Amino acid sequence: MKRLLLWAALPLLLLSCTEKIHDPGKDNKGPVEGELIAINGFYTLEHEGFKFKIREEEYNTAAAQSAIALLKENFEEINSLLPKSALDVMHKNPIWMERNLTDGAAWYHTSKEWLESQGYMTEKWHCVELCNFVHYVSWTKQNQPYMVLHELCHLYHDLALPGGFENPDVKAAYNHAMAAGLYVNTPYRLDKDTVIQHYDDYYHAKVYATTNQMEYFSEICEAYWGENDYYPFNYEDLKAYDPQGFALMEKVWGKRDK
């Protein structure tokens, strides 16, 4: 599991946790952007076409403000990288922010039934969620700078590609990579200064891209557009190491300006 980054397409892979809607109370409102009004305990904000929601009682905390500032930076970079057609899809559904709903950092919710069965808010269906925005900040700064992009690519894969998560082009590239053993014991970036050469041996675990075609897709999207913590780390690595995955990226997103 990618540093406990959790993805909600396969319910059995997710942590079980009961969602509770907190009473927003009256003591921690303070100044907010514009004339924001909390609905069902959440403020809805917008930046660069992206909408995001955060609990009223969390908004003015230092941790939340740090997460919001970083999220806005992520939005700006994503808007500068991706084609408008993809951004139009990604801008539609809000990103939800929770302080510590789980001990992961971010996930994408593809199943309304699973959300309901776990006691989570079904309004989060087809949305990306920062399920622990404290971890989101620290892990993004440590070695996962494109965490939000990764989750948004799950959303795009699910909602925009023909066949959704069963898209045949994605499955073909994934199956080829798995058959070729491309994502076995590859290097991993622990932080900006440290790369371990053999992930499987170091962690006694499998490289995250091997999980399924959904994680493979979002992992190579990180490499194509920016930087991944797992090898291939970037555009040039992906092009040289996994040509079929690279061709998939160009087919899905179009050729990228280097």
Each predicted region: which residue ranges?
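Positively charged n-region of N-terminal signal peptides that target proteins for export
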Residues: 1-4
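Sec-dependent N-terminal signal peptides
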Residues: 6-10
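C-terminal motif of bacterial Sec signal peptides marking the signal peptidase cleavage site
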Residues: 15-16
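N-terminal low-complexity, Pro/Thr/Ser-rich intrinsically disordered segments
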Residues: 23-46
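Acidic/histidine-rich, surface-exposed loop or edge segments in extracytoplasmic proteins
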Residues: 44-65
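Acidic/His-rich structured neighborhood in mature extracellular/periplasmic domains
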Residues: 55, 63-179, 246
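Metalloprotease/metallohydrolase-associated module, dominated by Zn2+-dependent proteases
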Residues: 122, 172-258
